[in-house]
Swiss-Prot record:
GO terms for biological process: chromosome segregation; DNA recombination; DNA repair. This is Holliday junction resolvase RecU. GO terms for molecular function: endonuclease activity; magnesium ion binding; nucleic acid binding. The lineage of its organism: Bacteria, Bacillati, Bacillota, Bacilli, Bacillales. Its cofactor is Mg(2+). Keywords: Cytoplasm, DNA damage, DNA recombination, DNA repair, Endonuclease, Hydrolase, Magnesium, Metal-binding, Nuclease. Binds 1 Mg(2+) ion per subunit. It comes from Listeria monocytogenes serotype 4a (strain HCC23). Endonuclease that resolves Holliday junction intermediates in genetic recombination. Cleaves mobile four-strand junctions by introducing symmetrical nicks in paired strands. Promotes annealing of linear ssDNA with homologous dsDNA. Required for DNA repair, homologous recombination and chromosome segregation.
Amino acid sequence: MAIGYPNGKKYAASQEELPQQKRKAPVTYGKRGMSLEDDLNDTIAYYLTHEIAVIHKKPTPVQIVSVDYPKRSSAKIKEAYFKTPSTTDYNGVYKGKYVDFEAKETQNTTSFPLSNFHDHQMTHMANVLKQDGIVFVIIAFQKLGETHFIPFEKFYPFWERMQSGGRKSVTIAEIQDVSDQIPYGLNPRLDFLQSIDKLYF
């Protein structure tokens, strides 16, 4: 319905009086608000609460260099550095077996760069494997929405190939050939124990 003035002119609202249309942000399906580490931490908390497995994330070692004591009851760290971690991110026990694994994520869609791993991590995982532990790598391709469970014995040949002058990355096709894809769920978020049951028990 048009509104008019008594003199016959039509009413036109100013820009300030018009309701502002809200601009909707474009919908993105990448990341979905959680990182691989968050997903794994939620998953292992679920396992612990339901007495399924005891797995913990190891804290990142920090070297404290300088501390200030402004009060007797408090301390303020003024300078600290990350130490190079000597082992993997996660370890624990499941069905009486020692479990040890490293988790990495990438934004790449075609390959995973092996530079994300370090020599000392590979040495540690190889040593755990020699002691008959369950050792594996979880790699998440965030943009693809895929998370892969790779037994260490199938992942290590890619590392050896790089060490002998070969490719410095693993293609997504190579990973899909040797891995078990972990489906996303509600609880637990990333049920990697399904992969352990399938491959080791």
